[in-house]
């Protein structure tokens, strides 16, 4: 923990994120993908069922001994509260009721947030959209670990602690990297949670409150489902920055494991992502993936080559915004225009390093030179 770390220890690339290019290609090849886009009522159904189960469990545990309270807190509440936190992901993309019903999506987010005891559904949406816009951007991706995290959590013990404190890091990291003003919806979210917490504590007591609150803290920490925090973008195979997980825990987590699929098409509900994979197997079957989130956590801790620094970092989008004096992101139309220009200039080799890119350029120029020489020889023969 805390060993010397330099800029070269991070995985730097000089191309844009790969999903924009993939999305464009896939829609041209498989136009039927558009039929999967939209919203899915099952998201709301799963959220409401999970919230009801948590409220019933909060009533049940109030009369149990503490050892059973803690056991159920980790096993049941940890699993269900983590599932609800992942529902913020679907709701944040307006996949529960569609883009035409934003208020319904926000209300569902408030309901999903209740058992977690910590206001987060609105804030998650506010920052998560930027993760898609600026994936891997050194300045603007709120999901990237800070340099301090990468320096602090390097050893096996450090990486174990890194996983345990994920709930804190995920809450604080965006505020440090790309802080944004507090919104009215966030204040409403806070007031609703304070009222809910007070009701639980007053009417059901300490055990019920502990069951819910620590279900969030433990469930988002060292818990099997927390493997998705690591599996999604940490570099397990050189040259790839997004990974999918195809395991049974997807049933509890709105298919969040289908992460390559989600980044390719954020407007497709999680329930439909397996269908996307079936439609375009040539775009997914050849990619490295995970089948166990527990193994992901184990490998992350044990492998000395893996750590918080094992993320792709780039500056292509923030540099473009800087050059056009739009890095503050205030002028949305200007930002979108610049990002559209970046998308149009997206590199056709999105996963290559600087050295590999140089090699590709050399090969390209060599090919052109060979073509020119052959053309000259052919022309000379005719003369």
Question: Regions from the language model: what does each represent?
Answer:
Residues 81-98, 102, 123-136, 234-235, ...:
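Acidic (Asp/Glu-rich) catalytic motifs at the cytosolic membrane interface
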Residues 138, 238-239:
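A short beta-to-alpha transition loop/helix N-cap that caps and shapes the active-site region
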Residues 106-111, 240-254:
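Membrane-cytosol interface motif
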Residues 43, 74, 81-82, 185, ...:
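Alpha-helical hydrophobic/aromatic positions enriched in membrane-embedded helices and signal peptides
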Residues 1-78, 110, 114-211, 271, ...:
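Non-catalytic, topology-defining segments of multipass membrane proteins
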Residues 223, 258, 270-273, 277:
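Short amphipathic alpha-helical surface patches that serve as generic macromolecular interface elements
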Residues 78-88, 120-122, 167-171, 212-238, ...:
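Transmembrane alpha-helical segments that form the membrane-embedded catalytic/substrate-channel core
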Residues 25-28, 103-107, 221, 225, ...:
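Generic alpha-helical secondary structure signal
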């Amino acid at each position: 923990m805390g060993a010397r770390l330099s800029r070269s220890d991070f995985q730097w690339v000089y191309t844009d994120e790969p999903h924009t290019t993939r999305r464009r290609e896939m829609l041209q090849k498989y136009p039927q993908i558009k039929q999967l886009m939209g919203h899915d009522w099952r998201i709301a159904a799963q959220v409401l069922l999970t919230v009801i189960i948590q409220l019933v469990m909060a009533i049940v545990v109030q009369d149990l001994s503490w050892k059973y309270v803690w056991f159920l807190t980790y096993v049941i509440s940890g699993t269900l509260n983590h599932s609800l936190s992942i529902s913020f992901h679907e709701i944040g993309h307006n996949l529960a009721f569609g883009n035409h019903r934003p208020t319904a999506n926000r209300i569902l987010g408030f309901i999903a947030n209740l058992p977690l005891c910590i206001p987060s559904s609105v804030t998650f949406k506010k920052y998560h959209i930027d993760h898609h816009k600026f994936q891997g951007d050194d300045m603007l991706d709120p999901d990237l670990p800070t340099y301090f995290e990468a320096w602090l959590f390097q050893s096996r013990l450090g990486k174990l602690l890194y996983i345990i404190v994920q709930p804190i890091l995920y809450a604080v990291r965006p505020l440090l990297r790309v802080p944004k003003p507090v919104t009215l919806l966030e204040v409403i979210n806070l007031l609703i949670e304070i009222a809910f917490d007070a009701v639980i504590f007053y009417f059901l007591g300490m055990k019920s409150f502990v069951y819910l609150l620590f279900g969030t803290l433990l469930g988002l920490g060292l818990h099997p489902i927390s493997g998705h925090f690591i599996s999604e973008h940490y570099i397990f195979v050189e040259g790839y920055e997004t990974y999918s997980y195809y395991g049974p825990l997807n049933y509890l987590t709105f298919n969040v494991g289908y992460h390559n699929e989600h980044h390719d098409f954020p407007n497709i509900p999680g329930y439909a992502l397996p269908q996307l994979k079936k439609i375009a197997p040539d775009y997914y079957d050849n990619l490295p993936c995970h089948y166990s989130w527990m193994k992901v956590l184990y490998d992350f801790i044990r492998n000395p080559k893996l750590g918080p620094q094992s993320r792709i970092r780039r500056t292509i989008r923030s540099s473009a915004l800087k050059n056009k004096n739009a890095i503050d992101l205030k002028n949305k139309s200007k930002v979108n225009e610049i990002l559209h220009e970046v998308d149009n200039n997206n590199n056709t080799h999105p996963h290559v390093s600087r050295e590999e890119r140089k090699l590709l350029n050399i090969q390209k120029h060599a090919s052109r030179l060979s073509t020119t020489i052959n053309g000259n020889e052919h022309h000379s023969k005719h003369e």
